Amino acid sequence: MQCNDVQATEPDIKVSLTRVGVTNLKKLVKLKRTNKRDIVLLPTFEVFVDLPSSQKGIHMSRSPEVIEEVVENILLEKEIYGVEDLSVEIVMKLFEKHEYATRAEVMLYSDYMMEETSPVTQKDSQEIAKIMARAYGVKDDCGKIHVKKMVGAEVVGITACPCAQNMLKENAVTSLKEKGFSSEDIEKILDSVTIATHNQRGIGTVMIEVPSGYTVGISKIIKIIKDSMSGEVYELLKRSDEAYVVEMAHKNPKFVEDCAREMIKRVVDVFDYLPEDTQVLVRQVNKESIHRHDAFAERNSTIRELRDELKTLTN
């Protein structure tokens, strides 16, 4: 029995839709590495196309079908080295399957396992970062497809609040003065101890556009995020490691804004070879320990704009 193509019929309400597709779709993916073993990921996909006002629905099954075809092709034939390139492959296939679409978008997220060593006892453990990629394609009036791709990571760290630390330092100075300590002794005491403050679990995110002919290493992005907070977090810490991590974080207090700005500076320094119109997204979220709310800072810009601002500040 032949079924009618209900999706191709006209809708009752003729309004176009920006994004229609599927989310929370998981697939096993293998990515190639030069002279190293393959990376195995279990990413979650979000896949969308636009829908014209003249059509009732997209052919929904075609979107997961595209991912299945691309993933199988990678496993059997084609060599893909990055999650951003995987996203581009899917976008191009979406246009083939959804001939009515003028825009297509793919987002993927995956846990990424790394080896980490504790700072004092040198204990090895597995640490998890989240890696992500986005590809966005637009079909012009001539039928030519233009695709932009981005790659990024999300990393958890620790931050120490400078404000509370400064207040506790002032309280300590007042208390020591009342007990008869000289200003010189107070300075020596405070230089010898770690001043307390409250901490946050910081979540840093960096997304960078990958222009055609360029590469952006995810490992470099992960390092930038780690180095931009008060300190790193570790799955395995012995007592001496724990003391070291806490002390170092308190010696490097940072607001959520400080972390975001530090990431911006490091991105500009590390990826100085990228074209000036390269898009960059930086985001920091700090999970507060003494509040129910979270702290948030973000910048969405280009390499040129960020570099120009940094130059202005240093001149």
Curated annotation (Swiss-Prot):
Pfam families: GCHY-1
Entry keyword Iron: yes
Swiss-Prot/TrEMBL cofactor(s): Fe(2+)
This protein's UniProt keywords: Hydrolase, Iron, Metal-binding
GO molecular function, one term: GTP cyclohydrolase IV activity
GO BP field: tetrahydromethanopterin biosynthetic process
Cofactor annotation comment: Binds 1 Fe(2+) ion per subunit.
InterPro entries: GTP_cyclohydrolase_FolE2/MptA (IPR003801), GTP_cyclohydrolase_MptA (IPR022840)
Family as reported in the entry's similarity comment: Belongs to the GTP cyclohydrolase IV family.
Subunit structure: Homodimer.
Name used for this protein in its record: GTP cyclohydrolase MptA
Gene coding for it: mptA
